[in-house]
Amino acid sequence: MTFGNQCDETMSHAILDYALDAGVSFIDTADIYPANGVPELVGETENIIGRWMKGRRKDVVLATKFWAPTGKNPWQGGASRRNILDSVDDSLRRLQTEYIDLYQVHFPDYETPIDETLGALDDLVRQGKILYAGCSNYPA
């Protein structure tokens, strides 16, 4: 469910309430959601989750992802150090939290050396901005 496109904020909060009440504690999103090609909506799902999460942060394991272009500049996408550092701060702000439990590279970035990506993610763990780093949509 990409909140902010398929359903409005009120319905999104109701879905999240229902899930939490049913025992669902893992919330997974991405900085690009809702991914519908409307630049003004980029990050809106994180905004909605952040507003919902007030007073509930300790009750959820929060995961989000980065990689897709979120702006017009060439560094606003991919798994480069610059994009990772900018993206995590943007996600933390939208999610209204001090840390992300699981921060994932959304897709492989064949242009950026993996050491650069892993080094930036390791720095975020050391800074306390993320607890764990992961990847999504990578081939086996």
PLM features per residue range, with description:
Residues D59-T70:
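A short, structured active-site edge motif that brings together acidic residues
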Residues P69-A140:
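Glycine/proline-rich, positively charged
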Residues I27, A63, L131-G134:
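Structural detector of well-ordered beta-strand residues that form the stable sheet scaffold
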Residues A19, K65, R94:
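Conserved catalytic core of Hanks-type protein kinase domains
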Residues M53, K65, W75:
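Active-site alpha/beta core segments
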Residues F3, W52, W67, F107-P108:
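Tryptophan-centered motif/residue detector
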Residues M1, T64, L102:
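Active-site-proximal beta-strand elements of phosphoester/diester hydrolases
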Residues M1-V60, E98, R126:
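N-terminal binding-site loop/beta-alpha segment at the start of enzyme catalytic domains
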